[in-house]
Amino acid sequence: SALAFPSHPKEIRYFPQQIHDLLGFLSNTLGEDHPFSSIQASPSISETYPEVWLLGSRYDSAMMAAQMGLPFAYAHFFGSGAHEGPAIVEGYRRNFQASNHLSEPLVNVGIHVLCAETEEQALKLASSRNLARLKSITGRAQGIPSVEDAQNFSYRNDELAFMEQYSRNCVDGDPQQVKNELYDLAERYETRDLSIVTICHAYEDRLRSSQLVAQ
């Protein structure tokens, strides 16, 4: 039923209204004439409700979060990364308008991280993530390939160039390398709030990466 209103919910021009609808629904401030006013959340929402963050990787998303007075999560892992990211986040801070939800700008940065005992091992594990990304943007998504499949894959020159560019926005390495890069990114984005996204073929490697980062 939610997708039936409005008639074309996936069109970007409806997105700001959908955010307003969500905020109104969570805070129980929708007008009586609103189509969603009679819908009740389950479990019920009392005095508190989840924080609403706007995730994005472009200036438009940052400006929307700023104008609505919402926290902004910058998706460093989407690809714009280090070249545009800090400027986009600074634009959000500069244009932030206080709201009932937030009195001052709040920033989180999402980063691809793969940590292993050695840099060589981390880069090897990351090859399956990189291939998965390549296949995803070229319409050939098939999940996360094994490291063996990734290393035996026949890459064209343009695909190799893409992989090199994509990996620059990822933090892969041994524990000390990862720590140094995360601290550097936190400083450049002027935030201590980082979200780590770890994508690799084997669960054990993903778990070990998280354990090493936590140490």
Protein language model regions, located:
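Active-site-proximal loop/turn and secondary-structure-junction residues that shape catalytic pockets
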Residues: 78, 113-115, 200-202
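A conserved active-site cap/scaffold subdomain adjacent to cofactor or substrate pockets
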Residues: 58-89, 93
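Acidic/polar active-site rim loop that often engages polyanionic ligands
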Residues: 1-6, 69
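A local structural motif
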Residues: 45-51
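Generic C-terminus detector
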Residues: 180, 186-215
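Hydrophobic faces of well-ordered beta-strands that scaffold small-molecule active sites
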Residues: 51-55, 72-75, 105-112, 194-196
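An alpha-helical appendage that flanks or caps ligand/catalytic pockets
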Residues: 8-41, 83-189
